[in-house]
Amino acid sequence: MEDDLNTLAPLGPAAWLFVCPRQDEWCDVLAALSLCDRSSSVAIAPLLVDLTVDRDFQVAVRTPISRYEGGVLTKVTSMWPAAFVFHNAEAIVSRTEDHGDVGGLCAEARARFGVASYRAEAERADTDFTELWAALGVDGARVVMYAVVGYGLKELLYAGQLVPCVEEARTVLLGAVEAFKLPLYPATLFADGDATADGAAAVGLRSRTPFVDRRGLYVSALSEALFYYVFTALGQALRFGHTEHLIDEGMKQFLQDTQNSVKLAPQKRYYGYLSQKLTPGERDQLLLCDAIACELAFSFASVYFDSAYEPAPLMNYSEWPLVRAAEGHADLLRRLSELKLHLSAHVGALVFSGNSVLYQTRIAFFSAANKVPAGGTAQDGLLKAVQFCNGLTCLTEDALNDACRTVKFEGPGGGGGGRDEQFTPQHLAWACATSPHLMSDLVWYLNRLAIYNTGQNGGSALYEHLVHCAVNLCPACRGRCCQSCYQTAFVRIQTRLPPLPKQLKREPFVLTLFSRFLCDVDVLGTFGKRYAGDAKEPSAASLAAAPGEARKVGDEAGLGAGGGGPGGRLGVNVDRLKYFNQILDYCKRNSLIDPSTGEDTLAVRGRADFMSALSGLNRCVDEAAMALVSEVRMKSNRDEVAGATQAFNLDLNPYAVAFSPLLAHQYYRAFFLIVQNLALVSASSYVVDNPLTVSSLSRWLLQHFQSICGAFASNSARKGLLFTKDAKCSKSVEFERFMDFALYAASGRHVLLSTETKLCKLSVCMLRTCRVKNRPIPRGGKGLPVSVFFKRDVVQRRNPVRGCLAFLLYAFHERLFPGCGLSCLDFWQKVYHNALPKSVAIGKMEEFNAFVKYVLNVTTEYNEHDLIDVPPSNLLSYVEYRFHNKFLCFYGFGDYLSTLHGLSTKLVPQNHLNFPHLLAASPKFASVAEYVLYFKKLKLDGVPPPHVATFSRESLVRSVFENRSLVTVAFGIEKYSTSGGSREVFHFGQIGYFAGNGVERSLNVNSMGGGDYRYMRQRFVLATRLVDLLLRRSRRETVLFDADLLRTRVLAALESHDTQLDPELAAIAEIMDGRGGEPPEYEDVLFFVDGQECLAASIVGKIKELIKKGVEDFSLTALGADAGAGGGPAGSAGGPESGGGAGAAGGEGTYDLSALFLDVENECVVLEGPTAAALDGGGDGDECAFPAKRLRL
């Protein structure tokens, strides 16, 4: 059902001027959330209710744009998600961190890379607000003024063609602050005469009447901030460098409806072509695709954003939990700073990923991919050949113009002769559209990100830089603020910066968006999942008549068909979750899992309880898996299972990230990249059928652009990736009280009249979501085997303490082996290697043997079927993994799955030394030793440690979406055509990887461990849960950071086969080496032990005990001696009082446990109950074949 446009977008102004009293606390909050730089007198604040706008503020309106005889024409637009503070912004800017001469850095980047610079209108002075202040009765020195503007009117604000109407000022509340807001009307409403063809032609940057010159809102500093933050950024996304022409055409597009005309191509230049080896035909095709993508994205940005959106829940500042929970103003500022620390992890991913959306500004032709597939068309080959990629290496190349002639680059190092070798501050400034506001904000985040040391420099590079700054030799700030300037920030994170690509690569792109709640991200995703529309199974006749139409591709009620093929509907006959819910019901009845939180509630008093509870649970899981196999064989087929798809949605509402102007900037970059990727579908069709035969690209576009626009409008949305919705106007003509604009322009008299209003366009299209998918079950190409990364040729034998029961063995170690005296890891290491000393109390030998054999059998059986290759961390994940592993193996699948993982941000304390921004003033240290001593004194004085955002793995990835998270994800846009006569092209977002070693340590590949391809099978979503905050490797150069090396040593220690050595003590010795007795954070230990939560908790607990005992020497020798003297294995572990069994009371040597392992080595599967009976068919065939034989009937 379509929404009513009259309700979504009421009549009213689409630009407002706010006049707010200067209040310290209000300015403090804005300083924390806004984009500011000391070089600019403008601040860019977030668009938030009760902070910058009032509660009655409308984010979508039908705004008057011109007059006709007897009435006013209106058009729908939505607000740009930011407020631009231009008067007394120093009250905000002065409260922010100084980052050096960022304005100078941006100017250097413009000169170096040929970016257009802002040119103020020399003949025009800034608006004098004296009369306005007098009319409002305010003191201009005591107020802050800012503008909020609609997407369609942003060009008018830049050009000073919005007229404030003080007569219509109204008083509003911004939280507890009382302010004024005045409407800003477009200059076209005050033009001489009604709207005519002649009057329309007068629209432009320099087309103003004397009235607008006199009364229009024009502030040069505001126009300059808009020039870079808004328009240069849009131009970069479109690969268009003539910024003033872009602004001029954007103004005409909104006021004159020129969406279907060619606007940018005559002035466009094409970079990155001369360094590609292309045939003339390939070059022409690429040029045309480039031009079409640029024009379509520019046109349809107006279609999508001059639309009617609803405000996002995140926009209500006063309802943020962190605001409501704040105990005073200082606590509020601390919480806002913590919010930004969470965001820093996402900002870091955008900066450190070589495939970040900030760098994807080049369009390239991959000739090797331009092959027509069997049964395909030339368009299919072109779709695969034309791709977007990293554009940092072509910034100084010569270009081609509209006539395909070479235009020399005018900057230094032009023509490609000065290719950069490494990422510099100028490259980041370019990626920020050379906006000082954006660049300065990024520096704030870079100053608070963790340092990744490589072992070659350690932290010494930072310390030496800061000592060097003592003589005022810092190039960024000349010694003014070396503790926080951009040069110091780059020295801190130098090892994490992305390398400049040496060759073109087709890669997924990294972006940050708000996630939607609806997702299908469990092991098999959409397969066998019933939705609201699937309450009744479709008849056989309906399936036969329209197998692919049972659910529309874009149905928001479900993320896809039950199976994964193009038709993919048979799988919906199967209700997979019915069987999984039976398992959950069993867990609830037996008090194994808390039904509300999902946490473990299993109570174990001893080994018998443990085996009984686990046997019953395993029996229930296996029976459910077998029942699902039976149903699938009756109602579905193997292809439907193989086509399972995991999917989740990203919110494309522009206000979903309105709380951060930096993320709002990135949102528009992401939008333009997505839309241009989809534009290539329409482009490829016309380019293949209509080769370039005219003298210029713009002439070709003039011939075909209207047809291309129509094709794009029909095939861009609801084809698998992008989803939109429409809203229509129920009545096109209304009467509203507007002032007499002509009289106001002529005499200044303000008279309200009942005016007829007509809406120019009766329907609008709104962006909803972008869908990202992953196929968990790998498939090779046609006739090709599955990739080696997914091949499961060998089933690894695992120590139980590293297997599926590890979380239980750690949790109940003291109850299973009371008085043992060994840590859980050390105990099972010795058991597994048949080296358990007789001095260890194990109870009765027969019970002990039975228990160990049971644990070994369950672990081995699980490993035989483990296709997920991710150790469970609790009972909920254990039953989910076991259920799906069993089902897939019983059904004949034997290769590893591709898995989705969620990593959520956490704030952890760090060493003061690595965060010089803690210094109150620019450092004046004579040596590194003096620097180190100063920071040690800070710590002793009680200065709180700085915190950084790090990631921890979620046990279930769906919790990322259920907790309404901000997510950073990498995905590519895949396109494929149907095989029928319609030849429709569909597309989907395929989740990918982050390019670069500095993004997040959990994503890095340890090159020292060959043959383990888990990193190629795992895909990650980086997330920050906003609930409780704002809502109730292609082969790459590998850099080994110190943390990676330490992790390798810790894992090697834990894997040691030396039974005379406690593995946990060996790990502790590695972790504590060089720390000076300082305990590590739990999250760091969790990283070192490869995410094994139970083991990490055990190690952290043991370290705390050792420190509490006063241990200062953490060498392995000292720790071993301390353990022996303190009642370790050789001490108090034995003895009748602790339940020691045979030989435990002072025996020597080791227990002989070899008999426990004989059966395990000869058995493949150990099942219980009906499942075991079902599989007990004899014979030497593959165990996965037994269910097939049993179920053929």
UniProtKB/Swiss-Prot annotation:
Region called Disordered, residue ranges: 1125-1145
UniProt region (Required for nuclear localization), positions on chain: 1170-1193
Motif interval(s): Required for filament formation: 827-828
Location(s), subcellular: Host nucleus
Gene Ontology biological-process annotations: DNA replication
GO terms of molecular function: single-stranded DNA binding
Source taxon at top rank: Viruses
Keyword list, A-Z: DNA replication, DNA-binding, Host nucleus
InterPro entries in the record: DBP_sf (IPR035989), Viral_ssDBP_head (IPR043031), Viral_ssDNA-bd (IPR000635)
GO cellular component: host cell nucleus
Gene3D superfamilies tied to this protein: Viral ssDNA binding protein, head domain
Role noted for this protein: Plays several crucial roles in viral infection. Participates in the opening of the viral DNA origin to initiate replication by interacting with the origin-binding protein. May disrupt loops, hairpins and other secondary structures present on ssDNA to reduce and eliminate pausing of viral DNA polymerase at specific sites during elongation. Promotes viral DNA recombination by performing strand-transfer, characterized by the ability to transfer a DNA strand from a linear duplex to a complementary single-stranded DNA circle. Can also catalyze the renaturation of complementary single strands.
Similarity comment text for this entry: Belongs to the herpesviridae major DNA-binding protein family.
Record's subunit section: Homooligomers. Forms double-helical filaments necessary for the formation of replication compartments within the host nucleus. Interacts with the origin-binding protein. Interacts with the helicase primase complex; this interaction stimulates primer synthesis activity of the helicase-primase complex. Interacts with the DNA polymerase. Interacts with the alkaline exonuclease; this interaction increases its nuclease processivity.
Name of the protein described by the UniProt record: Major DNA-binding protein
Gene name per UniProt: DBP
